[in-house]
């Protein structure tokens, strides 16, 4: 059976066909619409899936935000151009006439990355550092989603009570500091208005401010990981996302984590499936998990 997997992120929309063998075929992408209207997202999704849906028997969606009763509820609306609510499952069933499931993108990615781990691991946490900061928790070999879909939204835990206001409404969230959007928002002077990718490029060229912004992000993430270790006693933490997988970033996080007391150390791994983890995880969950 072939699954049409869809990944809805703050920067891009991706879709692919995934067979029962887990192989990804016909992957395609579109920019996430910047408009605040549900119609803009619906139109973009229609354009994305229309060439693929005839080859699939079901749809599995991995999306940023809280997924509750098949709908997307944005915890940080800025990550989707201000969109607060979107009926994901209903919309895709109407567009494709196929049975559809939906799950948070980081939760889906966590499940895919868990399948790739070697050894006897039952406790794992996945963190994605990209436009925002998200996560997924596997405990006892099972993915935690929570009754309201909030489980794993670790980017909205407190990093600095005097830090910037986050799009979720809290002050000083990890996401407001460590994410690509947070890195860019803190840039000043010649870097003001630059995106995270540009800031990483400047850091590689020796720009002191760019390097400080990236170190600030990595230090914040390391402290989050120490908190996660204290909370879950996980056996490993897998890091993904465009910032998390940027050259040199994970090594910086490891350096800052090593400065924490030994009890809070944990093995850090780069995401195995990289940018395809959300797609694959959603398809795997459609195969055998009740959401």
UniProtKB/Swiss-Prot annotation:
EC number: 2.7.1.60
GO molecular function per UniProt: ATP binding; N-acylmannosamine kinase activity; zinc ion binding
Residues that bind Zn(2+): 156, 166, 168, 173
Biological role stated in the UniProt entry: Catalyzes the phosphorylation of N-acetylmannosamine (ManNAc) to ManNAc-6-P.
Gene label: nanK
Positions that bind ATP: 5-12, 132-139
The organism's taxonomic lineage, starting at the top: Bacteria, Pseudomonadati, Pseudomonadota, Gammaproteobacteria, Enterobacterales
Reactions catalysed according to its record: an N-acyl-D-mannosamine + ATP = an N-acyl-D-mannosamine 6-phosphate + ADP + H(+)
Domain of life: Bacteria
Enzyme class (EC, first level): transferase
Protein known as: N-acetylmannosamine kinase
Subunit structure as annotated in this protein's UniProt entry: Homodimer.
Gene Ontology BP annotations: N-acetylneuraminate catabolic process
Pfam families listed in its UniProt record: ROK (PF00480)
InterPro entries: ATPase_NBD (IPR043129), ManNAc_kinase_bac (IPR023945), ROK (IPR000600), ROK_cs (IPR049874)
Signal peptide: none
SUPFAM superfamilies named in the record: Actin-like ATPase domain
Keywords: ATP-binding, Carbohydrate metabolism, Kinase, Metal-binding, Nucleotide-binding, Transferase, Zinc
Pathway: Amino-sugar metabolism; N-acetylneuraminate degradation; D-fructose 6-phosphate from N-acetylneuraminate: step 2/5
Family note: Belongs to the ROK (NagC/XylR) family. NanK subfamily.
Keyword Lyase belongs to the record: no
PROSITE patterns: ROK (PS01125)
């Amino acid at each position: 059976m072939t699954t049409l997997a869809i990944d809805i992120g703050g920067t891009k929309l991706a879709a692919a066909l995934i067979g029962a063998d887990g192989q990804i075929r016909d992957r395609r992408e579109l920019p996430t619409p910047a408009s605040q209207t549900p119609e803009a997202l619906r139109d973009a999704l229609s354009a994305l899936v229309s060439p693929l849906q005839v080859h699939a028997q079901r749809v599995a969606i991995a999306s940023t935000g809280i997924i509750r009763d098949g709908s997307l509820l944005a915890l940080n609306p800025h990550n989707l151009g201000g969109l607060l609510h979107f009926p994901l499952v209903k919309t895709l069933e109407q567009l494709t006439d196929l049975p559809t499931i939906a799950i948070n993108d980081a939760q889906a990615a966590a499940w895919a990355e868990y399948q790739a781990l070697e050894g006897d691991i039952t406790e794992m946490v996945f963190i994605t550092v990209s436009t925002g900061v998200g996560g997924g928790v596997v405990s006892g070999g099972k993915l935690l989603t929570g009754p309201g879909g909030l489980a794993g939204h670790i980017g909205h835990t407190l990093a600095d009570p005097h830090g910037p206001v986050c799009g979720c409404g809290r002050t000083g969230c990890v996401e407001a500091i460590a994410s690509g959007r947070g890195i860019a928002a803190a840039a000043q002077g010649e870097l003001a208005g630059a995106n995270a990718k540009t800031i990483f490029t400047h850091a590689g060229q020796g720009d002191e401010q760019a390097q400080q912004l990236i170190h600030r992000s990595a230090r914040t993430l390391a402290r989050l990981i120490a908190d996660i270790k204290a909370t879950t006693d996980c056996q490993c933490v897998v890091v993904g996302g465009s910032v998390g997988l940027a050259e040199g970033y994970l090594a910086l996080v490891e350096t800052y984590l090593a400065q924490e007391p030994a009890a809070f150390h944990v093995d850090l791994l780069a995401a195995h499936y990289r940018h395809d983890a959300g797609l694959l995880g959603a398809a795997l969950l459609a195969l055998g998990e009740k959401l």
